[in-house]
Amino acid sequence: MEAFNLHKKAVSRDYIVKPRLEYRTVSAVNGPLIILQNVKSPRFAEIVNVTLGDGSVRRGQVLEINQDKAVVQIFEGTTGIDNKKTVCQFTGEILKTPVSLDMLGRVFNGSGKPIDGGPPILPEAYLDIQGQPINPQSRTYPEEMFETGISSIDVMNSIARGQKIPLFSGAGLPHNEVAAQICRQVCLVSTCTLVKRSGKDEEDFAIVFAAMGVNMETARFFRQDFEENGAMERVTLFLNLANDPTIERIITPRLALTFAEYLAYEKGKHVLVILTDMSAYADALREVSAAREEVPGRRGYPGYMYTDLATIYERAGRVEGRPGSITQLPILTMPNDDITHPIPDLTGYITEEQIYLDRQLHNRQIYPPINVLPSLSRLMKSAIGEGMTRKDHSDVSNQLYAAYAMGKDALAMRAVVGVEALSQEDLLYLEFHDKFERRFVNQGAYERRDIYTSLDMAWDLLRIFPVQMLRRIPEKILQEYYHRTSNYEHKENKPHSSRS
């Protein structure tokens, strides 16, 4: 009788008014995946609305098609799904997210639904969460330096607007505090002076924060920090917490980046996107791969993880003819502090910069515990120098790197032969090593140093050495800056002009 009623319903249905097909053919549930049989013309990446027996609705996406079978991943998890009462409706649409300027100042879950108790969003458009690939020919080379107010970043690993800057961290390290400090203090070098004088932030600056698998404490920390600093009205949060479905973490960064692209390329805003924790995202990717019984790659992660991560990281940048930009700050915790782990390893290949947080510096009460030696910025050279920061910037950075590396060698030598066997030069390098970490790298969480102050502090440290030992700095630069008592009084106020 039930079959007769279903057949009667199908025959009498008005497919013009209600064209979507519905199925009750769930044959298997495997982790975050369900398998449907006898499906008519399913499409890859098609969105499926899954209605459970209790009336709740979940969303899924077609991952794999084999004749009349379809493998669907459920974003909200498969708990409670059975093969009798579950109804699956194929929408014929890809996954899109509503976007609107009203989303600024709001909090959403990992699926893009409001969770702050505010009114529903009135969308201005629905955009594909996969975004549109940027033509390399239309990309604008990043040439405007972001001043973070952190000396070890601004002087030695300068950030350009439109860059990807992952924070390589570990469990228990203050990566959240460093990311929050960057958000509080970041501005263009060319506009920082104007911002200080007016006391106002850039009106066209916005922050999109996406959390994947973080605990409630981390989410509360960022939200409270934004609110206390009066920045919440230009911040949008997408929160997938540790107790939320794992599979949801795959779409959370894409929702955040889609909204960021809307702000940058449609509304002309300069957007900073914070993604934490990318390790949780990669683990979710591994879980889906294992459920699909794919051949695993290194440490069980899928072989296509490099490509998948690139679809996220490469959505940063600037587009010619568009006034906005997207700068990414992904945070990833390295398992066992292993930088050769597949997640940081592949991330380092894709991104143009990496900031490495060191546990030994953290144990010595140095904040931020940024180890400058494994850190790097591949786009730094185009964003610094005369007319942009100061003409001695590049040479000072090179000399700091060289002196700090020599200090590390002297430290290792002292542990073997003792301090009595060290030469006078080695003792100078040891002194520089200690003062570099205690004075230059170490600074307060709410201490902001502009680029000129940081460069002056670097010169104060380099004066530990006689002029003949500063071999990385040209003679002309040494004559101009080495004997100055206060370089900050002679700063070159020739900022790089902002570009639309």
UniProtKB/Swiss-Prot annotation:
Gene Ontology molecular-function annotations: ATP binding; proton-transporting ATPase activity, rotational mechanism
GO biological process, any: vacuolar acidification
Record's function text: Non-catalytic subunit of the peripheral V1 complex of vacuolar ATPase. V-ATPase is responsible for acidifying a variety of intracellular compartments in eukaryotic cells.
InterPro entries, sorted: ATP-synt_VA_C, ATPase_a/bsu_AS, ATPase_F1/V1/A1_a/bsu_N, ATPase_F1/V1/A1_a/bsu_nucl-bd, ATPase_V1-cplx_bsu, P-loop_NTPase, V-ATPase_su_B/beta
Cellular compartments per GO CC: proton-transporting V-type ATPase, V1 domain
Name listed for the protein in its UniProt record: V-type proton ATPase subunit B
Cross-referenced PROSITE patterns: ATPASE_ALPHA_BETA (PS00152)
Pfam families named in the record: ATP-synt_ab (PF00006), ATP-synt_ab_N (PF02874), ATP-synt_VA_C (PF22919)
Covalent S-S links between cysteines: none
Keyword Translocase included in the entry's annotation: no
Family: Belongs to the ATPase alpha/beta chains family.
Keyword terms, alphabetized: Hydrogen ion transport, Ion transport, Transport
The protein's assembly and partners: V-ATPase is a heteromultimeric enzyme composed of a peripheral catalytic V1 complex (main components: subunits A, B, C, D, E, and F) attached to an integral membrane V0 proton pore complex (main component: the proteolipid protein).
Origin organism lineage: Eukaryota, Rhodophyta, Bangiophyceae, Cyanidiales, Cyanidiaceae
UniProt key word DNA repair: no
